[in-house]
């Protein structure tokens, strides 16, 4: 009969086969019987050979090692500490076998978790970030300063990232939300009272995402109405007043 090679029940190796047999026998991994496991393993290998299947050499090596370990179990041996187990391949012991099986099982379970995460990720689809410049009204691109709309967007993005990644260690207390008109008045009053401010410096406390968005929109509207102007200042943006009276705000 022509010899051919098969993957025995999709086992990845001798340790995988051993785990399968231990699970089938419902034996505690920490309290395995070397004699029973060896008999089951050798019987499985012999069955494969009886079918004239090409058994990988690593399975045969494990069979020989288990038989050697079984014979050693018949002799009185000293109790071995799990924390100081000799290499199983160099000096086969029951504790060494258990340790190898435990490590292999841990890797196998981790591989299964990663496989599940990979399959879940394949069901997700990434989306490229939108170009917000396409929504800009060409008639409102003059911001009465040395900044472009994209500069303001970059400043907003920096602040948004700070909000997203900063860890809040104190208890969160929800602040009263403001409308766009109310925030415009609040921003303009702050700029007038402080004779200017920076975009980051305006937030005396850690803002929420909602507060950050409405504040950014308020700044855009105030710039559009020529109430405040924006100027580049290092990595921040300087806001300064362009009108003398606060009541000139068109809200």
Curated annotation (Swiss-Prot):
What domain of life? Bacteria
| Annotated GO CC locations | cytoplasm
> Which GO BP annotation is one of this protein's?
cell division
Alphabetically sorted, this entry's keywords are: Cell cycle, Cell division, Chromosome partition, Cytoplasm
Q: Where does it mainly reside?
A: cytoplasm
The signal peptide annotation in the UniProt record is none
Q: Where in the cell is it found?
A: Cytoplasm
Subunit note: Component of a cohesin-like complex composed of ScpA, ScpB and the Smc homodimer, in which ScpA and ScpB bind to the head domain of Smc. The presence of the three proteins is required for the association of the complex with DNA.
Q: Which family does it belong to?
A: Belongs to the ScpA family.
Q: What does this protein do?
A: Participates in chromosomal partition during cell division. May act via the formation of a condensin-like complex containing Smc and ScpB that pull DNA away from mid-cell into both cell halves.
- What's the protein name? Segregation and condensation protein A
Native organism: Exiguobacterium sibiricum (strain DSM 17290 / CCUG 55495 / CIP 109462 / JCM 13490 / 255-15)
> Which gene is transcribed and translated to give this protein?
scpA
